[in-house]
Amino acid sequence: SGGVVAYANYTNISGVVSDVDITVTRVNGNWSSVGGVAGRLVNSNATNCGNEGTIHAYQYVGGITGYATGTITGCYNGGAITGNGYVAGIVGQTTKGVTACYNTGSITGAGNYVAGIVAFASGASASVKNCYNRAYVESTGSNVGAVVGMTNNASAAMSNLYYLDFTCSQGIGSAKSTAQTATAKTRAEMDSADFVTTMNTGMAGTFGSSRYSPALSWQTDLIGLTTPTKGNVNLDPFGYVDENDVELLRQYLVGEIELNDEQLVQADVNTDLDVNQSDLDLLIQYVAGTITAFPSVDE
């Protein structure tokens, strides 16, 4: 299943941003190969695509695609992704290259191979380059990483990979080579102009500046047009306020995750200097369209 196409074969998908929420329930068979743009990307490429929808399935689940044998370039995920195994912000499993991609959506698994960008990079031709993850990655299984869950070949190229330092305990869950690494960055480092330069290493002009962290250059004309003053709990570069922010705030209030200082400012939607159930209730109403603005505590 996919937000745009279920099975892409010998085709190219470009310039597509999906905002479709997907829940696939297992009835008689596997509820697998699910993506925000394409369920499976076979001998096909995805370029300059994005996902803002929430996705829940069993395995091979990704913000862009669940499974790929083609390249993925210049893509991002801002949606919350949940599943069992092979769950990631960009692709569940790939045998080819993933380049210049980033993730800001929370990733939650219950099994093995879970990551912010690529859950499983399979084979010598798989590569992950110039990518970063800024969201929590959690699973009770093994091979869990902020950027890559697992590589199974020492020749798979991993370079210029970064993640926000508190989002996961390790950048790559299991690597076949000491050269396959990802580097932790602080929030201040990710928000800096220097980090934009770092992300553009070897591919000048691919990333541009946004309010919180590097965004892809094809996005920069849109960034800021939808930015509200409050509610952007996941610090999405576009400034979207949606179900992903509701879920992060819910997790914070029940003690499942921590929020950093800037996220707490965004979560305090009624500006009473306290993040609590009242903020969550208002955020839910805003996302549902019941209210069109956040009231101040003084109103």
Identify the function of each model-found stretch.
Residues 1-229:
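Predominantly extracellular beta-rich ligand-binding scaffolds that present long acidic/polar faces
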Residues 223-299:
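Cellulosome-associated attachment modules in secreted, modular CAZymes
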